[in-house]
């Protein structure tokens, strides 16, 4: 299975769990609990990635990055953001000649 197919397949499964919940599904549980729970998990997993990177354990870091990626994808489905939207934005950023930090848009509201 190529790299994109793994990501696409997982994303499709997450979308399916949102549309057709399965009893006992962790993904379904996250959607049932709602945005606050999903965001809490994204925050937790982000912290775990940072700790794993600091510990310099590649296997642990890979696992934590996978956990974070999964929870980000759950958030994307919850907020109705498609993978192709992310791909298009990454492509636009890749095409920029200069992407200095001081030239980025500022966050206007939190």
From Swiss-Prot:
The GO molecular function terms of this record are: ATP binding; phosphoribosyl-ATP diphosphatase activity
Subcellular locations according to the entry: Cytoplasm
* InterPro entries on file: HisE, PRib-ATP_PPHydrolase-like
Asked if the Swiss-Prot or TrEMBL record annotates the protein with the keyword Nucleus, the reply is no
Q: Report the principal subcellular site.
A: cytoplasm
Pathway listed: Amino-acid biosynthesis; L-histidine biosynthesis; L-histidine from 5-phospho-alpha-D-ribose 1-diphosphate: step 2/9
Keywords recorded for this protein, A-Z:
Amino-acid biosynthesis, ATP-binding, Cytoplasm, Histidine biosynthesis, Hydrolase, Nucleotide-binding
GO CC list: cytoplasm
Recorded catalytic reaction(s): these are: 1-(5-phospho-beta-D-ribosyl)-ATP + H2O = 1-(5-phospho-beta-D-ribosyl)-5'-AMP + diphosphate + H(+)
Give EC number(s), comma-separated: 3.6.1.31
The record's listing under SUPFAM superfamilies reads: all-alpha NTP pyrophosphatases (SSF101386)
Q: Any idea what this protein is called?
A: Phosphoribosyl-ATP pyrophosphatase
- What's the encoding gene here? hisE
């Amino acid at each position: 299975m190529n790299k994109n197919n793994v990501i696409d397949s997982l994303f499709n499964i997450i979308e399916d769990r949102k549309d057709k919940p399965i009893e006992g599904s962790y993904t379904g549980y996250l959607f049932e609990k709602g945005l606050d729970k999903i965001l809490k998990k994204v925050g937790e997993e982000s912290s775990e990635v940072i700790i794993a990177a600091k510990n310099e354990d590649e296997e642990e870091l890979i696992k934590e990055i996978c956990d974070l990626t999964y929870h980000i994808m759950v958030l994307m489905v919850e907020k109705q953001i498609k993978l192709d939207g992310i791909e298009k934005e990454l492509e636009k950023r890749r095409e920029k000649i200069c992407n200095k930090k001081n030239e980025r848009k500022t966050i206007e509201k939190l």
